[in-house]
Structure formats: C-alpha cells, structure tokens
Amino acid sequence: MHLLFVTSIVPDGALASGYEIANAAIIAALRRGGARVTVIGFTWPGKAAADPENTVVLGAIDVRTESASAPLKLAWVGKAMLSGLTFASVKLRAVSARDVKTAIQQAGPFDGYVLNSVQFAGAFEKLFEDRPSIFVAHNVEHLSARENAAAAGSLFQRLLFRREARLLEVVEQRLCRRARFVFTLAGEDRAALGVASDDRSAVLPLVTGAKAPAHKGPRRIDCDAALIGTWTWQPNRIGLDWFLGKVVPHLRPDFRVRIAGHMPSGITSTHPGVEFVDRVPDARAFVCGAAVIPLISTAGSGVQLKTIETFELGLPSVATSRSLRGIDHRPGNCVVTDDPANFARALEAAAANVRDVDGSAFHRRQVEALDVAIRLGLEKLGTVRHEVLA
C-alpha cells in the first residue's frame, strides 16, 4: 500500500518540536506496518528534507506567527477573512491549489492519504477527496482555539481565536466524517471529535525515538527543576503562566528552576531561583541536569511529548492531570496534582530525594501499542481500497 502523508512541514531530521517528533514516530510506524510512505509538504527555510527520495517539497515557508513581521501578520489575517479559511491554513496558501495538485500527481500512483493534522488539509481540502484517507488529529484544534481565546490578552486576539475555533470545528468535523479512520494522540480527543467508536478511531501512543534513550551512568544534577518548550505556542504559554504565577510562589527561595526555550515578551518571575536560559544546545542533556521535571500542561489537547520524553528517560516528575493526556502507564516516580501548593511541595520532595527509574519498559510498551493501532488503521484503509477497486 502506497500512502501520501500530507503535512504542513516535512521531516528534516532535527526533531526540534513535539509536532516533528510525533510526525517522525507516526511515519516510522506506518512503514513498520508495511506501507510505503511518501511525504508532501513544505520545509522550514534553510532546511532540507531528511528523506528526499520519499518526499515532495512544495517550497520553503516559515509559519510561526511570533517570528513574522507585522505586515505579514496583517496579510495573513486579511487573506483568512477574504478566503474564509482559518488563520493557520491560510499561511500555507503560499502555493496555488494547481501547484499542489500537480505535485500530488507527480508523487506517483498511491492508494490513500494520511492527512496529518488540520492545517494543510484545511488549506487544500478539496484536493484530498479523490481517495480514501486517514486523518491524524494531533489535537482537537477547535477546543485549543477556544482556550486560547479565553486566555488572550487583547480583544483582537480574542476575536481572532474565536473565529478560528468556529471554523476549525467545522473543518475537523468534515475531515473526520470523510476519513475512513481517525488517529488521535489522546483518548479523550476521540469523543471530542465525534469518533469515539473503535471502528472509527484509535489512539496512537507515541515515542520520541526509534530506540529507548541510552543510560550513561549517574546524572550530574545542575538544578532542582528544569522546563523546556516552545513557550510562544499558546497552550504552552498558558501552562507556563500557571506555573510561574501559581506554583513558583510556594517554592523555597533557594529552589533552583531553569527554563529554556524561546520566551515571549512579558514572561518574568520575582522568585530568586528562577532562571530563563533561552535556547540550549542539547535539550536532552538540559533536562537530565535537573533533579525533577515539572510537567505543567493546563490547556490544549493531544499528547504532551515532554511527558513521554521524561518517562522514557526515567526522570522524576511532578505532573498536572492534563500533562498525562494519552498516557496509559504512569511510572512510580511521577506525582500527579493540580493544586499549586501541593505541586510545589512535591517538586521540593522529589528534588531532595532523586529517584530515577528504567524508562526502557515504558518505551517498549508505547512502541508495541503504537504498532497495533497503526495496523488497525491500515486495515480499515485497505478494506476501503479493495471496495473501490471492486
């Protein structure tokens, strides 16, 4: 079976974000399931596709709102209003539908589409109606947009996110309805998308790499707690605001917290132990230098890749319940609480008595369950393909 994996940004091997880590895991699982996979989408500027022989590149594009100029942001808003598309999808209209159709045809004969998230599929929706499809819902995007609207700092942002939520809900409903099968990254997302039946959907348990992270002896602890993420992404920003505003005030003054990742303006902390370190050369080494990892998601849907990485590494953690979306097995060194004061106390206790565990068993269970779910989706798609050919 030859599948066309339709995604906004094609893998470049860097695995710089949770989205890219998830894509790599899903593509690898599809191939383990026996499918030939060709990927189509854009590259980041200055980046090349990791697997050029099996990738169709539509061009280079930077879709990050935080790094866009004010004129470009206004242009995106204007195009979204005129076209009726979401703000997220209109960014991908850097090429015409005709160009995308030509690229699809040049990909060669194939049996179906894997529509990876709503952004690209929503930008060129009608082009993907001629063959059976699987829809991969990384998040319930319309619910995330509603949460973003509630947390928006300005009326303009609030109205923009509300519009995004309305449009996304309709597009997600259409993509799910047309898809022969739907993959989500968290169990609760199946019901939220109206595909809770086992005949319509399955959860994809993810991993951050093909192999479990290797242990290299005792860790060197540089700080009490460490966080790293794309804080300009609104659901992550909401969690960071909660952590800094609600949890950190309960921490001892000498408790050391290091926070890495691109930081939006306005993020500060008066706690003497909090340090913002911007980007770091090695994200894994950074988190392994902490006694405990705070998993602080309070918004959004889908799965938290930082949670998966923490569990694969066997690191101690304190997690909100939202941080465990899509996770069936919680290791013994993970404490769960949504109360800020209890969260702070649990961090201090974990840092005072560091207890790592072997994360390889967690990784192995995730891979096995991922492959089972992928095979189920491929079987559903294969059944439709045979019906069409008949």
Range-by-range predicted roles:
Residues K306-T310, P316-T320:
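Short hydrophobic beta-strand element within catalytic cores of glycosyltransferases
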Residues M1-A60:
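N-terminal subdomain of nucleotide-sugar transferases
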Residues F42-T102:
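A conserved catalytic-core segment of Leloir-type glycosyltransferases
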Residues A285-G302, L313-L315:
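Acidic donor-binding loop of glycosyltransferase active sites
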Residues K101-Q105, E141, G153-V182:
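Membrane-proximal helix-turn-helix segments that form the acceptor-binding/catalytic region
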Residues V203-P272, F276, V280-G289:
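Conserved catalytic-core segment of nucleotide-activated headgroup transferases in glycan assembly
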Residues P71-V90, I134-R166:
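Acceptor-binding helix/loop patch of EC 2.4 sugar-transfer enzymes
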Residues V95, A352-A390:
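A charged, aromatic-enriched C-terminal amphipathic alpha-helix characteristic of glycosyltransferases
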